């Protein structure tokens, strides 16, 4: 027994026109002589158009079964066909075509294909008519998705900045630690150099004092030698003729000369020592200048250290601010996700309510069709009776006239009843649409 469907069957020309309007390539020959190779791509286009399931999405669903299925490469095509059939069957159930079978894919029949395409086209028309009722929800959903995408991109950007700041912070801390260690070493070296400088200055002052004393003594010796030479010249003028006295004076003079010579040798030695110490002092003075230059470099490094410390503090504040912004963005993201979830739940609830009301309306239409069928059968019976009475018109003309009037009155009452039922149905559908609009708003 053929299953009854709630949608009207469309004509061949109308089906081809609607499919062409959807932008799907499908010829009249493929509709009249359908094959599996022709209908499977057509159904794939329907899934892509109405469910957003592309061939790539289908491959991803099949590939997700790779870990749970043995010999995946061998049965890949069979798995793909099975998954495709399951999704397509679910789609057919949703558009009220409940007797879709695998034969419709493998060995499609012309009449069933025409019926299936009628179901899809009627669903597309109904979807297009009802789509305006959900425009606000769709726009809100798209707006929320765009906001979520933007916030997610900002969150990733901030995370990258935080990671970069943390890396810079670690590098700055390592550089600061190295600078602190180097500054500590240089500070200790400066303290030692300062101590050595003070010792060298003390030694230098002592040597200068000794040099000045030696210069004074040297001048004294020179003056003494000059006076001695003068005395010798005086003595030469007054030569002593007594040998004993002469020998005594000679001995005294020799002794004085030897003493002067020894003093001169000592003075020469001290002068050489002083020259050596002066050279050492000059070298020490060069070392002191180098130490002063190192000290200036240390001061520059200390300034750099202070600048790096200020920069580190600024980066730390920036990192803290970024963390605060990150937490705010995460909180905002959770709020948006909750709003999106609530909107989706509301949309699903509205769709479920709409489906229930549509099912009720379809059931009512089925009942009306059954009643109309019964009325039509009764009308056919009356017509048959009328034909029999027309055959006997010569015998019972008056009786036939009366029955004809009675039949016409019954037909008019039936027509009026049908019109009433039709007006009730239209009123019910209008009330249903108004309730749907009020529930959506």
Swiss-Prot record:
Transmembrane segments: none annotated. Gene3D superfamilies: Ncd80 complex, Nuf2 subunit. The keyword Transcription does not apply. It is found in: Nucleus; Chromosome, Centromere, Kinetochore; Cytoplasm, Cytoskeleton, Microtubule organizing center, Spindle pole body. InterPro entries: Kinetochore_Nuf2_N, Nuf2_DHR10-like, Nuf2_N_sf. Disulfide bonds: none annotated. Acts as a component of the NMS (Ndc80-MIND-Spc7) super complex which has a role in kinetochore function during late meiotic prophase and throughout the mitotic cell cycle. Acts as a component of the essential kinetochore-associated NDC80 complex, which is required for chromosome segregation and spindle checkpoint activity. This is Kinetochore protein nuf2. It comes from Schizosaccharomyces pombe (strain 972 / ATCC 24843) (Fission yeast). The gene is nuf2.
